[in-house]
């Protein structure tokens, strides 16, 4: 059985300390690999299923790559919350968001544990996450996120897929990609899959990730 950095039996302080230590490396990696441009293209081709005033959560925002991509591409004003366990990562994300030009969107930052999120049931119309569920047991992570989504709401997950590139990233960032069959079964148990997007192989994000949009029934 995989040993995850963050589980229900490990303290937030211990897990948060790990993320704080890797924040700069994590941020540098995303700066040079073109993930932001790939996300812009994805959101241009697949607009987020939101309406004016929708409540959106970036669960595990890290240094803000996905949050910033949403700010660049959202066409309507939403209530956006960005949450992460690492204070250092969130500080970096806040800095980048503050420099975002011509954005009418407001972002609320919160520190929290993805396995025990500080929100009531059905608090969000859309939750997005990337590179987070690989740090936690799949059932626990999915269950907690599904709890927060309204019936008819959406969940956008950018999971890691098993590749040589993913294996290198596993060693670098101490996560564990979930087996595709287990990921598919767990996704279908909580959501109806609307789309499963494969990033182009010539984009670095395509070496390790896909994008799965699910709807909570």
Residue ranges, per PLM feature:
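Class I SAM-dependent methyltransferase SAM/SAH-binding core
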Residues: 57, 63-115
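A short glycine-rich, Lys/Arg-flanked "PGG" loop and its adjoining helix->strand segment in the class I
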Residues: 140-151
């Amino acid at each position: 059985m995989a040993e995850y950095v963050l589980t229900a039996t490990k303290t937030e302080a211990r897990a948060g300390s790990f993320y704080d230590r890797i924040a700069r490396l994590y941020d540098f990696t995303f700066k040079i690999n073109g993930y932001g441009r790939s996300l812009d293209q994805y959101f241009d081709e697949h607009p987020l299923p939101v309406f004016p005033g929708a409540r959106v959560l970036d669960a595990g925002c890290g240094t803000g790559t996905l949050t910033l991509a949403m700010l660049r591409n959202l066409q309507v004003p939403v209530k956006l919350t960005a949450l992460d366990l690492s204070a250092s990562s969130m500080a970096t994300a806040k800095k980048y968001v503050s420099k975002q030009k011509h954005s009418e969107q407001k972002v609320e930052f919160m520190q929290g544990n993805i396995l025990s999120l500080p929100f009531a049931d059905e608090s969000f119309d859309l939750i997005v996450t990337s590179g987070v569920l690989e740090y936690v047991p799949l059932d626990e992570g999915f269950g907690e996120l599904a709890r927060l989504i309204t019936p008819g709401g959406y969940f956008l997950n950018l999971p890691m897929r098993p590749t040589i590139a993913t294996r290198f990233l596993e060693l670098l960032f101490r996560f564990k990609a979930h087996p595709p069959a287990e990921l598919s079964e767990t996704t279908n148990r909580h959501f109806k899959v609307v789309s499963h997007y494969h990033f182009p192989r010539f984009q670095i994000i395509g070496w390790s990730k896909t994008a799965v949009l699910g709807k909570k029934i």
